[in-house]
Regions:
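Left-handed beta-helix
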Residues: 5-7, 11-12, 20-21, 26-27, ...
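Short beta-strand-to-coil "C-cap" segments at the C-terminal boundary of structured domains/repeats
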Residues: 99-103
Length: 105
């Protein structure tokens, strides 16, 4: 069963959101509609572990045994199949990191 942290929300009631049953989603995440969080690829077998305060925008796909850091923003219709560090902003298909946000103290 997927583990979903406290305060995490699914846009539009989770319309067309697919979450692999072994995935882990941290606290205070925001998952848009039409998002897939799925299993395996040959380079990163397994399922995603998503950190806290992550925004996954509509139509995005996150898959494989990867770790998405805290405070990450994944833009709309982005495909992510590689690990992301904390505070990354990633967009595109294939996804690419366009910025690392400064952490606030």
């Amino acid at each position: 069963q997927a583990k979903i942290g406290k305060g995490s929300k699914f846009g539009y009631g989770g319309i067309s959101v697919v979450v692999h049953h072994d995935s882990v989603i941290g606290e205070n995440c925001s998952i848009g509609q039409l998002v897939t969080i799925g299993g395996g690829n040959s380079k990163y077998p397994g399922v995603p572990t998503i950190g806290n305060n992550v925004r996954i925008s509509c139509g995005s796909i996150v898959f494989g045994g990867i770790t998405i850091g805290n405070n990450v923003v994944i833009g709309a219709h982005t495909v992510v199949n590689f690990p992301l560090p904390d505070n990354a902003v990633v967009v595109g298909n294939p996804g690419r990191i366009v910025r690392i946000k400064e952490s606030k103290c």
